[in-house]
Swiss-Prot record:
FMN binds at residues 125-127, 238-239, 278, 293-297, 319. The keyword Flavoprotein applies. The lineage of its organism: Bacteria, Pseudomonadati, Pseudomonadota, Gammaproteobacteria, Alteromonadales. Homotetramer. Its cofactor is FMNH2. The gene is aroC. Keywords: Amino-acid biosynthesis, Aromatic amino acid biosynthesis, FAD, Flavoprotein, FMN, Lyase, NADP. This is Chorismate synthase. GO terms for biological process: amino acid biosynthetic process; aromatic amino acid family biosynthetic process; chorismate biosynthetic process. PANTHER family: CHORISMATE SYNTHASE. GO terms for cellular component: cytosol. Belongs to the chorismate synthase family. Reduced FMN (FMNH(2)). InterPro entries: Chorismate_synth, Chorismate_synth_AroC_sf, Chorismate_synthase_CS. It comes from Shewanella baltica (strain OS155 / ATCC BAA-1091).
Length: 364
């Protein structure tokens, strides 16, 4: 109905607004017996949390998650897991000047037209603040996937504006505020963001997310293909305007002889498909990329209109991210984890007794 849930066997439902009392989510379908505490989720929440860098919004939220249900004596019970994060640093007065004004590039106009009203404070339900609960739920999925099945998920910023990562050093990702894997570009990123902030403008970014250890067989053709559900989940992240699986749009210029991921008993020779063939995981790493648009909440004046249809000028005040991609890495990881968790449980429900005599291939 209202689009607040994702998944079939591992179901995540979120609620709450940017300037409301709290954010929350319900997780249905988590298997019992998983050791789980708030600390298991807090690490990823801290990675997403606002106010941790001079290049993100100045809004300071501790984002401390509370487990309300579904955990007893430190383990999941198999019943619904209730999670809550209180909002503590709302400054709704920053938005009083746009109560009847539509910000171009935002959901103000479409929410008003769809619902006949809108919560103008920080974007309400359309704010990326809602993704805190996705990250919390994703952390539960990530722990189960790693602990029970050896599946690991990690993401990084592969491009910010014109600056692209030339090398991928996974050890660098958590060592800088950009989640950037190329240390040689950090100085350029820092300078670029300083100048951008001075100008009052914003910039887009590209985020890459990878899952390793994914078994063969996840995905439910034809309408619940694994790559289709991954794309659906990643496109549901605020500001995402494009998703690629594997080589993505790069396949347009590839020849069939170049992009077909040759096989031998020793394994696959390449992974242009991004770990999915025919909508089913191949056992290779799942590789996806997302493109995030620059936020429209900028201090550069722009033309818009009021709710009454009158012309108006917009100069956005408040605390905003000059590049929303900086905090998107843990969100992308969470969405991939939720999809993989859901498909793992679905596959187990239908196919746990299937035995194939064909060798399982890895990368050569």
């Amino acid at each position: 109905m209202s689009g607040n849930s994702i998944g079939q066997n591992f179901v995540v439902t979120t609620f709450g607004e940017s300037h409301g009392v709290a954010l929350g989510c319900i997780i249905d379908g988590c298997p019992p017996g998983l050791e789980l505490t708030e600390a298991d989720m807090q690490h990823d929440l801290d990675r997403r949390r606002p106010g941790t860098s001079r290049y993100t919004t100045a809004r300071r939220e501790p984002d401390e998650v509370r487990i309300l249900s579904g955990v007893f004596e430190g383990k999941t019970t198999g019943t619904s897991i209730g999670l809550l994060i209180e909002n503590t640093d709302q400054r709704s007065q920053d938005y009083s000047n746009i109560k009847d004004l539509f910000r171009p590039g935002h959901a103000d106009y479409t929410y008003q037209q769809k619902y006949g009203m809108r919560d103008y404070r920080g974007g309400g339900r359309s704010s990326a603040r809602e993704t805190a609960m996705r990250v919390a739920a994703g952390a539960v999925a990530k722990k189960y996937l790693k602990q029970v099945h050896g599946i690991e998920i990690y993401g990084f910023m592969s491009q910010l504006g014109p600056i692209c990562a030339q090398t991928i050093d996974l050890d660098q990702i958590e060592q800088n505020a950009f989640f950037f894997p190329d240390a040689s570009k950090l100085e350029a990123l820092d300078e670029y963001m300083r100048e951008l902030k001075k100008s009052g403008d914003s910039i887009g970014a590209k985020i890459s997310v990878i899952a390793t250890g994914v078994p063969v067989g996840l995905g439910e053709p034809v309408f619940d293909r694994l790559d289709a559900d991954i794309a659906h989940a990643l496109m549901g992240i605020n500001a995402v305007k494009g998703v690629e699986i594997g080589d993505g749009f790069g396949v347009v210029t590839q020849k069939g002889s170049e992009g077909r991921d040759l096989m031998s008993p020793q394994g696959f020779e390449s992974n242009h498909a991004g770990g999915v063939l025919g909508g089913i995981s191949s056992g290779q790493p799942i590789i996806a990329h997302i493109a995030l648009k620059p936020t429209s909440s900028i201090s550069v004046p722009g033309q818009s209109m009021t709710a009454q249809g009158e012309m108006a000028e917009v100069v956005t005040k408040g605390r905003h991210d000059p590049c929303v991609g900086i905090r998107a890495v843990p969100i992308a990881e969470a969405m991939l984890a939720i999809v993989l968790m859901d498909h793992l449980l679905r596959h187990r429900a239908q196919n746990q007794d299937v035995r194939s005599h064909t060798p399982v291939l890895g990368m050569r």
